[in-house]
């Protein structure tokens, strides 16, 4: 395993970190046996950084129990996040943090983040509640070792956040399709210049730069036949690791095979190691990808549940597939997401435009507006009637 140094703490952090949010299982109940297998294999492969959050249903408790069963807590750097938007008074900081320690079965958090900062105003609000004194107290007591924030706002606001506090690290979304999106390359460079460790999330854009890559984009990679970069995932992860400013990237690995594949890649993907030919290949793939990337949804599920039962990520995935593959492919996926698994169709036309989903979207997608695009593409009158007839027939 390749390790990179956190400039603030001196910690040697594996270039590949384990994002635990996507552990398989029922909603809110990650499968314990699978979690044990993934975490155990990750540590065997040299991964020493695990990321979870209060707002990932059931995830902190799953990770904590797994680390205790496996006896691995002392071998990893554990990261979780404060749901700052739910903090209404200073006492809430302790209330959430103490609950997180209990869930994770630990007496300290190695890397603690303000979760999903989208504007400096969010930080200013908790500063007014006294969070700076609270952080200082927790760090002095050894219960928080490093403090940082995860970010999903504009590039300009990211620079403001960097200077708003004496941060130890930050976590940004970064991939070859997002150099000018959110913090972007400019933000990565600015954070590194300030001496912060920079952790990367969504290096494969929720899988859209890996297994879900459009065929025409994948064909560019296939034609190159690189002896080391044999999959779209390998290309995407290597592109992120090619930046020396990146301390570590998180991958939401869902089985041990993914752990093995990504760990092997992390051994070779050194900073500034990609050739001009490889970087040109990435640029050509990006050109093809952007032709079909109509809605930048990563499938994170923060928008769910919808009060009308609409499968928002599934609908956006179908919409993009209709451009990446064919209209009929997209329609089939939309049918599966909206009708096959329900007793009555949960069509995008059911949207009441309450806006609840959009308020939670890290990508700042105007979800009600984009669902209208999905409706126009997939719901001409005969199709809508067919959906409803199918559900009625099945339930009778």
Predicted features by range, described:
Residues 6, 18, 35, 42, ...:
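Conserved, mostly hydrophobic/aromatic
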Residues 61-80, 132-141, 193:
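Alpha-helix-loop-beta-strand connector modules within alpha/beta enzyme cores
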Residues 74-86, 112-115:
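A short, structured active-site edge motif that brings together acidic residues
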């Amino acid at each position: 395993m390749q390790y990179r140094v956190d400039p603030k703490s001196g910690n040697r952090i594996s270039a590949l970190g384990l994002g635990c949010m996507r552990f398989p299982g029922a909603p809110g109940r990650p499968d314990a046996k699978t979690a044990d297998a993934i975490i155990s294999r990750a540590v065997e492969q040299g991964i020493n950084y695990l990321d979870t959050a209060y707002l990932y249903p059931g995830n902190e408790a799953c990770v904590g129990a797994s680390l205790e069963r496996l006896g691995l807590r002392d071998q990893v750097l554990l990261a979780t996040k404060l749901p700052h938007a739910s903090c209404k008074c200073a006492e809430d900081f302790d209330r959430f943090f103490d609950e997180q320690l209990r869930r994770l079965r630990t007496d300290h958090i190695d890397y603690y983040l303000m979760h999903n900062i989208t504007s400096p105003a969010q930080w200013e609000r908790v500063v007014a509640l006294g969070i700076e004194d609270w952080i200082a107290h927790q760090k002095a007591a050894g219960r928080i070792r490093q403090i940082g924030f995860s970010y999903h706002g504009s590039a300009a606001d990211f620079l403001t956040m960097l200077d708003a506090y004496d941060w130890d690290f930050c976590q940004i979304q970064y991939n070859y399709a997002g150099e000018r999106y959110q913090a972007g390359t400019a933000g990565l460079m600015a954070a590194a210049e300030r001496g912060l460790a920079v952790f990367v999330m969504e290096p494969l854009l929720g899988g859209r730069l890996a297994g879900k890559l459009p065929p025409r984009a994948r064909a560019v990679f296939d034609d190159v036949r690189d002896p080391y970069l044999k999959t779209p995932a390998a290309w995407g992860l290597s592109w992120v690791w090619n930046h020396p400013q990146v301390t570590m990237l998180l991958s939401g690995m869902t089985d041990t095979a993914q752990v093995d594949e990504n760990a092997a890649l992390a051994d070779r993907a050194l900073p500034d190691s990609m050739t001009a030919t490889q970087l040109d290949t990435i640029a050509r793939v990006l050109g093809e990808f952007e032709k079909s990337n109509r809605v930048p949804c990563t499938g994170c599920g923060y928008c769910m549940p919808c009060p009308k039962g609409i499968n928002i990520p599934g609908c956006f995935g179908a919409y993009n597939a209709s451009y990446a593959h064919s209209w009929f492919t997209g329609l089939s996926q939309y049918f599966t997401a909206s009708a096959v698994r329900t007793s009555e169709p949960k069509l995008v036309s059911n949207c009441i435009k309450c806006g609840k989903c959009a308020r939670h979207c890290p990508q700042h997608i105007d979800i009600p507006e984009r669902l209208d695009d999905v409706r126009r593409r997939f719901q001409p009158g005969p199709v809508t009637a067919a959906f409803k007839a199918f559900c009625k027939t099945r339930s009778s």
